[in-house]
Amino acid sequence: MWSLTYLIANICGSIVISVLGYAGEVVTPTWVIAVSALVLWSPFIGVLLWTSKRHGSGNFVKDFSLSFQATDLWGVPLGIISQLLLVVVVTLPFQWLFPSIFNSEAVEKRANDLFDAAHGAWIVLLVVIVVICAPVVEELVYRAFIQHNLGVAYGARIAVLISSFWFAAVHLQIAEFPGLFAFALVLGICFARTKRLGLSIVTHVAFNATALVVMALTR
């Protein structure tokens, strides 16, 4: 069911971009990205809501462990270190072995494109999408739903590995895969250890925020 949801969501997202006339464009406006993201995420949230009502308690927050504690603030330095150090260290061997694929330009292309498309007040919308919405939705999907259910079936370690691989793969950028997989392992371990989404969400927020700050400072 989840694979079908993913397929439908991506088809809908692609249709929206095409209808708006930005298919194949090098730089897509931030408002188009926002609309596309909303369409892309809606089927996932819909399935989570349905799952909570059909197979859970009906309490969305409880069913998907969406709670926070003060200790989750450790996710801030963890996310920053993951962005500035972990991703770089993990990607470096691939850059040495396959420089034409894993060069810095390719690894940073998505972040650069997003930042280049945002001007003036649109930067605020970009921050909302990348720093707030994306981490919450992705942690609900990949940790609270996919990893949790895989853990029930195959155990925590296998669940972390598979959900992390899936997380990195669905971003559809081979140059980003090593770094995203390593970061997803961090997020998966956070969720497995705490049994809550708080730490993984805060870590993810800090990770994405750091990427935007780096983009801004290097312009």
Task: Name every feature range the model reports, one short phrase each.
Residues 1-70, 209-219:
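N-terminal, membrane-interfacial amphipathic/helix-forming hydrophobic leader that caps
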